[in-house]
């Protein structure tokens, strides 16, 4: 199934690749089919051959198997991260990084901005149990998983199946992330680009939906200002700008030039206990290309400004 999904989505980079870039497809037949499609961007090239003629490779996200494949194919070492950078990318891709950035961010922006959000790194079954029993509703997360997977919703009881899941995650990943449950009203993200000099740049917003389990469903295609206006019905645009500026500083400090490429920070607008609204400024950090960036680039590059529709990327 993962290989089939990868094959089906191999055309997707055509919509966000740089002009003159080359998109690799899984088969020559698929490449010939794509070359005949008039609706696809004409500014990219296609190839089905995995040949070491490119100095730079831009994948959806980096993993050891891709690096190994590039090495075996003879690609130059400029085309992929070094062993040390891969270790660092894995480290900062874990949810522990989001916990760290959330704490630093809340200190950075001070008490004048309505924020909320706590997260805890738990290293033993006893600590996880104490966390679960002390929260009427909460989430437990595996440090490394994606798209809503690796998440358990708990309601103050410590069951045998839950204990089994916890022990498995602690055995394989050594820690579990615990987060209180919040009264979420809106999912959105700020999207960024980390450059080769270690600077992090804000590139826009994304507005997305998840199912009841927190699994990603779709992204809205809309102008950046429209998304900001939607979020600003809960918190002001100036607050969003302050959070974005603080995030650029904190992300650059965490990444420290180890990663070059797109990344996104998932956020939430939540209802507070007194009936007001607050922003959770760092729910997840996606250190890779993501559907929010894809939606942003598709709209900015291919949709007429001012067009409003319920079209989405799914």
Regions found by a protein language model. Give the residues of each.
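A long amphipathic alpha-helix within ATP-dependent nucleotide-binding catalytic cores
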Residues: 172-173, 180, 202, 215-277, ...
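Conserved N-proximal alpha/beta basic substrate-recognition cap immediately N-terminal to
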Residues: 3-12, 24-133, 146
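Short acidic, Gly/Ser-rich segments with clustered Asp/Glu that frequently serve as metal-coordination loops
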Residues: 143-145, 285-292
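Residue-level marker for buried hydrophobic side chains located in beta-strands
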Residues: 23, 138-139, 263, 281
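Peripheral (often C-terminal) accessory segments that flank ATP-dependent C-N-forming ligase machineries
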Residues: 304-314
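Active/binding-pocket-proximal capping segment
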Residues: 289, 298-306
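Phosphate-binding site of ATP-dependent enzymes
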Residues: 136, 159-217, 269-282, 290
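Active-site nucleotide/adenylate-binding loops and adjacent lid/helix of ATP-dependent enzymes
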Residues: 91-176, 196, 225-249
């Amino acid at each position: 199934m993962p290989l089939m999904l990868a094959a089906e989505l191999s055309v997707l980079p055509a919509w966000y690749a740089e002009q003159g870039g080359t998109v690799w497809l899984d088969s020559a037949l698929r490449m010939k089919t794509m070359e005949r499609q008039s609706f696809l961007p004409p500014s990219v090239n296609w190839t089905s051959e995995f040949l070491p003629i490119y100095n730079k490779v831009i994948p959806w996200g980096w993993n050891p198997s891709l690096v190994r494949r590039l090495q075996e194919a003879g690609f130059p070492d400029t085309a992929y991260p070094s062993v040390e950078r891969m270790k660092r990318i894995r480290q900062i891709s874990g949810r522990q990084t989001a916990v760290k950035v959330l704490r630093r961010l809340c200190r950075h922006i001070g008490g004048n901005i309505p924020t909320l959000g706590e997260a805890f790194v738990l290293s033993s079954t006893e600590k996880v149990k104490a966390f679960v029993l002390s929260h009427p509703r909460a989430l437990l997360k595996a440090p490394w998983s994606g798209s809503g997977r690796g998440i358990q919703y708990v309601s103050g009881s410590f069951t045998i199946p839950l204990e089994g899941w916890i022990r498995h995650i602690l055995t394989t990943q050594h820690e579990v992330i615990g987060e209180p449950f919040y009264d979420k009203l809106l999912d959105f993200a700020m999207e960024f680009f980390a450059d080769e000099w270690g600077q992090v740049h804000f590139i826009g917003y994304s507005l997305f939906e998840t199912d009841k389990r927190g699994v990603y469903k779709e992204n809205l295609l809309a102008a950046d200002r429209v998304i900001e206006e939607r979020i600003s019905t809960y918190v002001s645009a100036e607050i969003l700008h302050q959070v974005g500026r603080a995030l650029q500083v904190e992300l650059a400090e965490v990444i420290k030039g180890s990663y070059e490429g797109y990344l996104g920070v998932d956020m939430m607008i939540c209802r507070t206990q007194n009936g007001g609204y607050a922003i959770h400024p760092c729910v997840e950090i996606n250190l890779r290309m993501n559907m929010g960036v894809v939606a942003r680039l598709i709209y900015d590059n291919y949709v007429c400004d001012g067009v409003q529709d319920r079209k989405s990327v799914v």
